[in-house]
Amino acid sequence: MQSRPAQESGSASETPARGRPTPSDAPRDEPTNYNNNAESLLEQRLTRLIEKLNAEKHNSNLRNVAFEIGRPSLEPTSAMRRNPANPYGRFSIDELFKMKVGVVSNNMATTEQMAKIASDIAGLGVPTEHVASVILQMVIMCACVSSSAFLDPEGSIEFENGAVPVDSIAAIMKKHAGLRKVCRLYAPIVWNSMLVRNQPPADWQAMGFQYNTRFAAFDTFDYVTNQAAIQPVEGIIRRPTSAEVIAHNAHKQLALDRSNRNERLGSLETEYTGGVQGAEIVRNHRYANNG
């Protein structure tokens, strides 16, 4: 009879124990989640570190750094800002650099003249895609023969599925600009063409040029470095040497003297000329002392 209260008390003491979580009832995945998150963060840091190190790798080492193009432009103060309406305003270097100035030479064919020449050549029946090639072949030929206004050329210029007389191309150029002006416009192109083919003007020896100056034996040699002329894509292969410049200028002076012997006469009437050519212009270079 006394054992029942003992059972009741024992069951009463067991009831609150069920409400308390025992160590075995605690969630077991919390340490696992923490470890996974820590591992993921470490992997992210490792990935970012590798990416940063890869971005810093390079195979160049810049030295003597100096940039002008693309640098931030400065804004001058109000006292130094130029008034565009004042012709005496002082231009800054930045303003001069940004100013678009075309390089012009009055001794070459202009764009308008070249447009007329191209139009007339196309009017002969030359396909438009071959007009530039025909012009270039003409000026290369003139480097071997002459670009004189008195030139009477022979032969024809060929292109794909056709040909055109040289006389026709020369006449068109002489009519609109002058043959020599067109040749001056293409002087750098002709210079590169001769050098890359190792093909100097054909008459260089007959003109008195030495072997080391043979590439200077054409009329428009003195326009090879002119920036107003049409430039090759890569630039000229090499600049003319001093020996080539001296040889060209000497020959040019002799040629001008020979052709200008009648320019000394005030009139070409027989009363002045006596029916003969003017006296030869003589220049004695034997006594030139440049040493």
Swiss-Prot record:
Membrane-spanning residues: none
Protein name per the record: Capsid protein
Keywords attached to this entry: Capsid protein, Helical capsid protein, Ribonucleoprotein, Virion
Job description of the protein: Required for genome encapsidation. Forms ribonucleoprotein complexes along with TGB1 helicase and viral RNA.
Protein's organism: Lily symptomless virus (LSV)
Region described as Disordered: spans on this chain: 1-36
InterPro entries linked: Carlavirus_coat_N, Pltvir_coat
Superkingdom of origin: Viruses
Record's compositionally biased regions (Polar residues): 1-14
Lineage: Viruses, Riboviria, Orthornavirae, Kitrinoviricota, Alsuviricetes
Family: Belongs to the potexviruses coat protein family.
Compartments it resides in: Virion
PROSITE patterns assigned to the protein according to its UniProt record, in alphabetical order: POTEX_CARLAVIRUS_COAT
GO molecular function terms noted in the UniProt entry: structural molecule activity
GO cellular component, one term: ribonucleoprotein complex
Major site of localization recorded for this protein: virion
